[in-house]
Amino acid sequence: MAIQFVINLLVSVIWLLVTNSYTLNNFVLGFILGLFLVYLLHRVLPGQFYLVRIYRIIMLIITFLTELIKANFGVLKIILKPRIENKPGFFVYETELERDWQLVLLSNLITLTPGTVVLGISDDRKKIYIHSIDFSTKEEEIQNIKSSLEKVVRKVGEK
């Protein structure tokens, strides 16, 4: 991925030198030409096309921000109710992530989401212990995490 970006920048700089025009517009045009060239050569270059990984990271950020906003409103709803009706609880989330950095990223995203805290990870790195401030059902909580956060974390790690 890094070599593809370096080649793209190199093509941009060469474009600036060949055209003898050192403007931002010309650099952007050279960058787009370099992007096209790297895309044509990405089967020969190591790794996947680097814009795919950048797109997946952007989707991870958007998904996390969406979950963050939904969780904030959920916690706000709990706080503003005159009666305490939430049912906090602990549950075990079994993950299919294989790499340590993916597991840590998922755990951090869960903890950063209001209303949930990761308490620990099992020794076999297949289970995450989570506390939720409003525990409706285990299946619903697990499906929520699996369909949103774990899905995009897994995609970022794919090659």
UniProtKB/Swiss-Prot annotation:
UniProt-recorded Gene Ontology molecular function terms: antiporter activity; monoatomic cation transmembrane transporter activity
InterPro entries reported in the protein's UniProt record: Cation_antiport_E
Compartments, as annotated in UniProt: Cell membrane
GO terms (BP aspect): proton transmembrane transport; sodium ion transport
Coiled coil: none
Function: Mnh complex is a Na(+)/H(+) antiporter involved in Na(+) excretion.
UniProt name for this protein: Na(+)/H(+) antiporter subunit E1
Organism, scientific name: Staphylococcus epidermidis (strain ATCC 35984 / DSM 28319 / BCRC 17069 / CCUG 31568 / BM 3577 / RP62A)
Species classification: Bacteria, Bacillati, Bacillota, Bacilli, Bacillales
Name of the gene: mnhE1
